[in-house]
Structures are given as C-alpha cells and as structure tokens.
Amino acid sequence: MDFSLDRLSNVRLAGIELTQIDSWDDLGFADAARLALAVTQKSLPMDFRAHLLAENPADNDTEARLLRMDWTLLLQDRETVSGVFENEVLLPPGQPQDIPLTISLNLVDFFEGSAQDLLELALSIAGAGGAPKDVALRATPVINTPLGPIRYPQPITILNREVGNQ
C-alpha cells in the first residue's frame, strides 16, 4: 500500500478562509482584529481537510480495503492532534483513492507568537506562503486482505516535508 498527501482543502484560521490570503497584508481590518483577539483569548482554531491518496499497487491481483487509520499530525516536530479515520475504503489495484482527514487544532495550544506569526504558520501549513515549516503525518493503517485484517506494526510517515516559501 502506498500513501501520499494529495492536497489540503477548506483551510480556515479562526473562521477565516485562507485560500485567497498569502500574507498578513492580505487581511482586511476585521479579519486582522479577529485573529489578534483570538490569540489574546488563546483560542485560534485551525481547521482543514487533508486529502491523502491510498494506492494498492497495480501489480497486486487483489482488492484491499482500508478499514481504519489512526493518525497524528506533527508540526515543527511537535505532536499536535490525533484522530481516527474509520470509513471503509475499497482499494482496487492501481487506482488511487481519496482518504479525507478532517483536522482541527488550536494553534495557541502548541505555538506561541503574535497573530501575524501564527497566521504565517497557518499559511505555511496550507502551502500558501510563510516561512518554511516542517509538517509530518504519522499513521497506522488497518487493511483488510484475503488473509484478514492487517494492522501495520509501526506507524508510517505519510507526509514529512517542509512547506512554505523558501
């Protein structure tokens, strides 16, 4: 089984959609004030969907099924949030399948800084700009095969890369 990150979608920081924002200067006054207030209240929610691709190798004669996947998001080598994907996904040989993970975290639980610093971090994670940041996703899939369910014995790193501008 091969897993990779396809894309992120629906990236929001304190309810602000980040798709059209590349830097602090792109924020309107109201959004900048909302972020600053969220930081002072120590509640800066970041929500997004990470779309993974799962591919059963083309030379495999048998369909497999992803039954479950435990995952942990790491930012700057810090474990942040964990979750479980529990939707069964059929994995025909050679046909990549979308595995959408809904991820929510409070950035101020894991990082310090100004509203501008934390926006830069969020933009880096979203791949929209900011200084480079290390992002990793560790997962432990459970795959159903003709031999029965197989749980990976060790977590695998699906994504481990530096994101943001260089």
What do the predicted segments below correspond to?
Residues 1-166:
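Extracellular/lumenal and peripheral-membrane lipid-interaction modules
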